[in-house]
A protein has these predicted regions:
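Periplasmic/extracellular loop-to-transmembrane helix junction in inner-membrane transport proteins
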Residues: 1-19, 35-37, 81, 185-190
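Membrane-helix interface segments
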Residues: 35-43, 71-72, 129, 143-144, ...
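Faces of alpha-helical transmembrane segments in polytopic inner-membrane proteins
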Residues: 24, 46-55, 82-108, 139-143, ...
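Membrane-interfacial helix termini and adjacent extracytoplasmic/periplasmic loops
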Residues: 59-96, 167-170
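Transmembrane alpha-helices
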Residues: 19, 104-107, 111, 115, ...
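Transmembrane-helix boundary motif in ABC transporter permease subunits
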Residues: 16-47, 60-62, 110-113, 118, ...
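C-terminal transmembrane helix and the adjacent membrane-cytosol boundary/short C-terminal tail
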Residues: 39, 108-124, 194-223
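Interhelical loop and adjacent transmembrane-helix boundary motif
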Residues: 1-5, 166-205, 209
Length: 223
């Protein structure tokens, strides 16, 4: 019977990071959609940076940012007692950083695909911006938000480079599935690594299949 600890650590890290990304992604998408300014493109470029930056670069930046020598790391570790580096919290932080752009991108695109005349009509009828957002914008962007959430969760499950840099490989604490596969191969235990490889491949196929089914349903509705 294989040790399921890496599986449950990955699920916990991915779940917590996805909840955070879900909330922050929708919040930022709403701000960027409703409050366009000259800074919009710059902010979006910064948000999307984790997509193109190497994971090791992200991990290095996070390691420096949360180290005790940095003001933020000092505040969290020495004053608030929250240790990020080489803990599962660090794995969550890494997963949030790498998966956030996917959630944001899908959500804001879902908002932009809505016909603005629907919201303008609601405004002329006296609906508040808050009511428009919760009654029109969110429901009509449901598929985009679900797709973004699924991709964010999948990205968090598969995160390796940044997690290795900031959380390290600590059995029973930070050994997520990608890290476990890497170190099993390093130890010459490829037959054990195959189990987790098949788990991740099956998970990825199920995510992609579900998203394709959702897209097909959307196209049928349009037709």
């Amino acid at each position: 019977m294989p040790d399921l600890t890496p599986f449950w650590i990955s699920i916990r890290v991915a779940f917590v990071s996805t909840v955070i990304v879900f909330i922050l992604g929708i919040a930022l998408a709403r701000i960027m959609y409703y409050r366009k300014s000259k800074w919009t493109h710059l902010i979006e470029s910064i948000v999307l940076l984790p997509i193109v930056l190497p994971p090791t670069v992200l991990g290095f930046l996070l390691l420096m940012f949360f180290s005790v020598d940095h003001p933020v790391g000092h505040l969290l570790t020495d004053i608030l007692g929250i240790k990020v580096v080489f803990t599962w919290v660090g794995a969550v932080v890494a997963s949030v950083i790498v998966s956030f752009p996917l959630m944001y991108q899908h959500t804001v695109q879902g908002f932009r695909n809505i016909n603005p005349r629907m919201m303008n009509t609601a405004r002329t009828m006296g609906a508040s911006e808050r009511k428009i957002f919760f009654k029109i914008t969110l429901p009509l962007s449901k598929r985009a938000i679900i797709s973004g959430t699924m991709l964010a969760f999948a990205r968090a499950i598969g995160e390796f480079g940044a997690t290795l840099m900031i959380a390290g490989y600590i059995p029973g604490k930070t050994n997520t599935l990608p890290l476990e596969i890497y170190f099993l191969v390093q130890q010459g235990r490829e037959h054990q690594a195959w189990l987790w490889v098949l788990v991740l491949v099956s998970f990825a196929i199920s995510i992609i299949g579900t998203m394709n089914m959702m897209n097909q349903e959307r196209y049928r509705e349009v037709d």
